[in-house]
Amino acid sequence: MKNIHCINHPLIEHKLGILRAKETKPFQFRMLIDEISSFLLFEASKDFSLKEIEISTPIQKTTVKKLDEKIMICPILRAALGMLESVFKMIPDASVGFLGFVRNEETLKADFYFQKLPKDAKKRTAIVIDPMFATGGTAIEACNFLKSQGVKKIKFISILAAPQGLKKFSQMHDDVEVFVACIDEGLNEKGYIIPGLGDAGDRVFNTL
């Protein structure tokens, strides 16, 4: 699966260990989600195009480089809201396109209930964020929708992923690069990532 990138880094592994622990408090959990998301964004943005512009330093004029892509961050509600601020800090000029999915606990499929994209979405590079990449259903439907709206370039960032979901996704969207901090063992009978970290949304918003 050439489109799947698992980012190996000692600091990511250290932070993941704390993130997984059930004793980790909500404010710590949010901070760790934010920090790990920043690492993943660095990797996902390596091929972003740049343009040269002329500026004046306090000493003289010089040529510098500036991002030459219009970015749209697409958080999948609600858990991905915990990742949004870290991406905004790195790309403050980005627009946000919200995608709402709710998991059907009987079928384990993702039901699409809300979307709000910028008017120029088709001209933007989409960075879809969702902390958990489990069955792949939500990721597939999110990319299906974005492509139906004319979005040409999509990247996906997740904290944890299950191999089953990544394989299924790659079969449907091999043109979408996925960046994850860790690929876990798999899924349990309820479709949750194991060993995982629990319900990311509940832990971010302290609704356990």
Swiss-Prot record:
It catalyses: UMP + diphosphate = 5-phospho-alpha-D-ribose 1-diphosphate + uracil. Binds 1 Mg(2+) ion per subunit. The magnesium is bound as Mg-PRPP. It is an enzyme of class 2 (transferase). GO terms for molecular function: GTP binding; magnesium ion binding; uracil phosphoribosyltransferase activity. SUPFAM superfamilies: PRTase-like. InterPro entries: PRibTrfase_dom (IPR000836), PRTase-like (IPR029057), Upp_B (IPR034332), UPRTase/APRTase (IPR050054), Ura_phspho_trans (IPR005765). Its EC number is 2.4.2.9. Uracil binds at I193, G198, D199, A200. Its cofactor is Mg(2+). 5-phospho-alpha-D-ribose 1-diphosphate binds at R78, R103, D130, P131, M132, F133, A134, T135, G136, G137, T138, D199. Keywords: Allosteric enzyme, Glycosyltransferase, GTP-binding, Magnesium, Nucleotide-binding, Transferase. The keyword Protease does not apply. Allosterically activated by GTP. GO terms for biological process: UMP salvage; uracil salvage. Pathway: Pyrimidine metabolism; UMP biosynthesis via salvage pathway; UMP from uracil: step 1/1. Belongs to the UPRTase family. Catalyzes the conversion of uracil and 5-phospho-alpha-D-ribose 1-diphosphate (PRPP) to UMP and diphosphate. This is Uracil phosphoribosyltransferase. It comes from Campylobacter jejuni subsp. jejuni serotype O:23/36 (strain 81-176). The gene is upp.
